Amino acid sequence: MVVNDFYDVHLLIHDIDLFDSGCADKIKCSIYESIVDSVPVCKITFNSSPDFLNNYPIIDGTKVIIQIKSDIFSIDDQYIFRVMKFSALPFGNMFSFSIEAVIDFYELFRAPSKYSTNNNSCEVFNTVMKKNQLAGSIHQTQDKQLWVPSETNLGQWLSYIAAHGWSSQQSGFYWFMNKSKNLFYLDIDKLIHESKNIVKFYYGDTEDEDIDEQIVRYKNIIIKTTPGEENLFNRGYDGECHHFDLSSYSTKQTNANKVRATSEIININKELSNGLGKSLLSFDVGNHHKNYFIAEMQNRRVLSTYSTYVNLSCELFRPIKLSQVCTIDATSITREDGEIESLKIKYIISKIVTNISGSTVNMDVELCTQGYNGLSTESY
């Protein structure tokens, strides 16, 4: 089905295209991907006749294929999900169907024992990529140890590894998979300071849309700042951190550490409040890299400084990628003399919601950067 004169869109369940088959109406599909919630999901709603399930039975694991093509914007994407939740409610003489699905990578929910390695944490992610023939990007780490999973699935274990990833006293690691099933394990400090492939967001109407994939127009913008302790990356600064010391065979408090993470806005070269509150899910036998405990505190601290969020509504879907570095034209402050000063701040695309219906294909984008707290008391 052609939408907006720009896109050829297909939504397939059991190889039946909901848009073109005529078996459903009021079809809406939203794809959610985020660097905080590492696994992409989608939600589909539509109305159809009561015999829809007789013809196309939907159960856990049913494949959902979403295709978006555009010659103008050089898009030829296919996203595959698997049903994890389904409901059908009577609505007059029709049924209202709701489907929630997760990215088609079941390996994330299996036991990850075959990925154990005595190497840097980045090699765990590289092994997952190679064994499952995935694309993506992995940043180098300096945290060699024996990485062995406990009773977790692969997704949980990757989150645990990322929380203890380390490369330097500036690093802040996180991982995610995007809707194209590409795997990423990134250092946010390295990403924002070394990236050269920068997307530029400009305010403008649809008819002003630039074909350049590095230029994206938006219609609405909301900017909000949250204190670090409320940031999604952070679980709070209070509490003490302890570890088990084999030499004395007792628990000891982990020393606070000074980090050299970079920020032009706030001072994060300070002690980490005697450690961040944390809990250990299993007994630690002493096999950990020398920065194992400090890494968890530093990762939380560095990531929590990214506490300014910008939400953009874009009327058209563009091939931007999660975690790309970008700039926006609305970043400025008003000085005391009334002059408006532009702030050339780099943002990271932290969330993308792709919305598809019979009349439009658009996206809502969330950007994040280090907080404005303390930068200026003037309006911005």
Locate each region found by the language model.
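An acidic/polar, Gly/Ser/Thr-rich interaction patch typically located in mid-to-C-terminal regions
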Residues: 31-57, 205-380
